[in-house]
């Protein structure tokens, strides 16, 4: 795992999305996502508009079980509808995750990294090592690349932040890299 992947793995574990565990294809997962959308958009009308379906379609998706008159299963969204629903709900969950992440990144404590670290172009005698980078550090610059999923930029941004903290250029190499903070 390179520095970008290690940083992303730590951030994903530290700031979970809050998305329901149940898949959107299950009644439970679908209703949970619909509830989140209705809460965020002020009711069924706003939620249906955000997903891009009519209010009537939204109402039918809400129903579960079987129709009492016909005994047939109620209408559920197809693949395209589920993609729309999951995408719109995902934005809601990512926004909440973003708020938590930005607050946590502003006051990261006990920042550590493990890997082959070049300080100003030089390797230490024992190249693979764990370094306590800082007791407290502002890592808000990591948020943008993490949100975009840009691993290369995320790794470079982390290296630059650590370099600023130590007034030195650093480069983390190798595939056995770890990053952590509290």
Where are these regions (language model features)?
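DNA major-groove recognition helix of helix-turn-helix/homeodomain DNA-binding modules
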Residues: 73-94
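Recognition helix of helix-turn-helix/homeodomain-like DNA-binding domains
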Residues: 52-76
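Long, low-complexity, charge-rich intrinsically disordered regions
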Residues: 156-182
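Helix-turn-helix/homeodomain-like alpha-helical modules used for DNA recognition
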Residues: 94-165
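Short, amphipathic alpha-helical "recognition" segments used to contact nucleic acids or chromatin
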Residues: 20-42
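Short alpha-helical "recognition helix" segments of helix-turn-helix
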Residues: 42-52
């Amino acid at each position: 795992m390179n520095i970008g992947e290690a940083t992303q793995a730590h951030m994903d574990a530290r700031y979970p999305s809050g998305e329901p565990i149940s898949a959107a294809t299950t009644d439970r997962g679908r209703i949970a996502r619909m509830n989140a959308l209705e809460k965020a958009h002020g009711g069924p009308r706003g939620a249906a508009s955000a997903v891009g379906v009519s209010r009537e379609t939204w109402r039918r998706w809400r129903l579960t079980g079987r129709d009492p008159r016909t005994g047939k299963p109620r209408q559920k969204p197809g693949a395209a509808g589920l993609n729309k629903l999951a995408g719109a709900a995902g934005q809601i969950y990512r926004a909440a995750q973003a708020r938590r992440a930005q607050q946590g990144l502003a006051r990261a404590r006990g920042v550590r990294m493990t890997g082959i670290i070049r300080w100003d172009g030089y390797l230490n005698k024992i190249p693979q090592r764990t370094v306590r980078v800082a007791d407290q550090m502002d890592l808000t610059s990591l948020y943008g690349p993490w949100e975009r999923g840009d691993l290369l930029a995320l790794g470079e941004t982390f290296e630059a932040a650590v370099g600023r903290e130590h007034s030195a250029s650093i480069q983390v190499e190798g595939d056995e890299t770890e990053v952590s903070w509290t």
